[in-house]
């Protein structure tokens, strides 16, 4: 029972202070823009969704059979017809795909003409296998993902700024020092440090006025399929 409470506390810390996907204005704005067609009855797809459901009209896809998802499938071989969806999105999942270029081409294949693809990718983020962790993308790299899939890149911007990037670096570094001294304390230390340094994330908006993408936490972009 004690272990169960610790897992619950750890999950709360992770979701509240670490693994957040929609807690920035840029992410909220991009999602609201892309998800508008779903309000008029069109279908959408969320690739690598985990148990996150950004909208009730989105079909969720993931490789993990243990999750509460709609479809178990590989992002590189989506089991859907061409032009089946008005909207496709993938948030902080492509870094776990061995061939993200093929995965984005597949997302483009199942997208309607004039449909939109939203991609959110991490930049400054520690190694986090799920089950593996292969890639990090710059803003230019994200544009390249859209272009190689034959999509028109509408926009790419910072999803989480330099404050989040610094938060992640300090948390990982501090937890690593603690682990070197006493290995079992790594996860508790990481949770405490995530809370302690959380105010750094509040600097994202202020730093966005400067050339802060060198240590941005991540990027978000929207691509459109030609009509």
Feature map (PLM): residue ranges:
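Residues that form or flank phosphate/diphosphate-binding pockets in enzymes
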Residues: 55, 98, 129
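Conserved N-terminal segment of class I S-adenosyl-L-methionine
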Residues: 1-78, 83, 87-91, 101-104, ...
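Short catalytic micro-motifs in class I SAM-dependent methyltransferases
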Residues: 92-96
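S-adenosyl-L-methionine-dependent methyltransferase catalytic module, highlighting the catalytic core
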Residues: 21-25, 101-102, 106, 112, ...
């Amino acid at each position: 029972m004690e272990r169960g409470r610790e897992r619950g506390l750890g999950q709360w810390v992770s979701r509240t202070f670490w693994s957040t996907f929609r807690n920035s204005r840029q992410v909220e704005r991009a999602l609201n823009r892309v998800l508008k067609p779903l309000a008029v009855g069109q279908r959408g797809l969320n690739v690598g969704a985990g148990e996150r459901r950004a909208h009730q009209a989105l079909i969720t896809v993931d490789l993990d059979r243990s999750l509460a998802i709609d479809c178990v499938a590989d992002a590189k071989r989506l089991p859907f017809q061409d032009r089946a969806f008005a909207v496709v999105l993938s948030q902080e999942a492509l870094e776990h795909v061995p061939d993200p270029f093929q995965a984005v081409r597949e997302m483009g294949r199942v997208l309607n003409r004039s449909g939109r693809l939203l991609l959110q990718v991490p930049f400054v983020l520690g190694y986090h296998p799920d089950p593996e962790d292969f890639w990090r993308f710059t803003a230019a790299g994200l544009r390249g993902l859209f272009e190689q899939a034959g999509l028109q890149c509408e926009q790419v911007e910072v999803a989480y700024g330099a404050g989040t990037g610094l938060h992640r670096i300090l948390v990982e570094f501090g937890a690593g020092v603690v682990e070197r001294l006493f290995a079992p304390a790594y996860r508790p230390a990481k949770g405490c440090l995530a809370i302690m340094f959380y105010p750094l994330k509040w600097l994202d908006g202020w730093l966005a006025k400067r050339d802060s993408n060198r240590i941005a936490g991540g990027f978000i972009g929207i691509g459109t399929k030609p009509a």
